[in-house]
Amino acid sequence: GDFGDMVKESIKPILEKQGYKVTLTEFSDYVTPNQALAEGAIDVNVFQHKPYLDSFKAEHKLDLTEAFQVPTAPLGLYPGKLASLDAVKDGATVSAPNDPSNFARALVMLNELGWIKLKADVDPLKASKADIAENPKNIKIVEMEAANLPRSRQDVDFAVVNGNYAISSGMKLTEALYQEPSYAYVNWGALRTADVKSKWAQDVIGAYKSDEFKKYALERFKGYKYPAEWNIPAAGASGSSAASAPVAASQASASK
């Protein structure tokens, strides 16, 4: 996946120049990478956003720490039958992922756009249709399996699509008319808390924060949501701090 490619194509060469041996291990689930990290089978993992890590380590009593952000394929609003945000019309149809966490992200995005208005006290992680206070454009939100969103674009006016499914279906992230502006769900690299201040860990963090990696990532992963400290706005985004909710694009972890 993309996080594995970042290691192979940029991070590994940077660290090897400093004398490290880097071994990449790829996982196909969201549980093993944190357990392997906690147990010492790997030294770093890169696959998850902070809310997922926070809940996982609390549930499993693991002493892990998020150490650096990585470019992440974001949730985006893509054209369907209509090609621009200005073309939105009364009764427009918008498809969105049907799982609760990603549906909440979609609602937050539509709220950001001003197409709907959510209740003032809504928890953005848990927003549902019941939290829509106003719908001045009579937007019809069509819920469907996240994996089916890309190919159903021709059936709706706009589609809210997860970055990983957009990429796997051949869509370009740069086609998005709007990306969620929140940095709450950019993915992080995680370390064992006891290791964070060690020389090797600081060198790994330094590699991900280096100008060399930034230059590579901006060229190789166009349209991604980049680390907040890079200060690069998302497509059509205003940089809101409203939270959104989980999607992990792919799994990869690097060990020294």
Predicted feature residues:
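Short, polar/charged alpha-helical segment
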Residues: 1-23
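Short helix-initiation/N-cap motifs at beta->coil->alpha
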Residues: 24-35, 122-151
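Pocket-flanking alpha-helical
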Residues: 30-61, 77, 83, 168-170
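Alpha-to-beta junction loops
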Residues: 38-48, 92, 115, 137-140, ...
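Ligand-binding "clamshell"
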Residues: 55-67, 82, 155, 160, ...
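A conserved helix-loop-strand patch within extracytoplasmic ligand-binding domains
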Residues: 67-117, 214
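A bilobed periplasmic-binding-protein/Venus flytrap-type ligand-binding module shared by bacterial periplasmic
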Residues: 74-85, 185-200
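Periplasmic-binding protein-like
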Residues: 104-111, 208-229
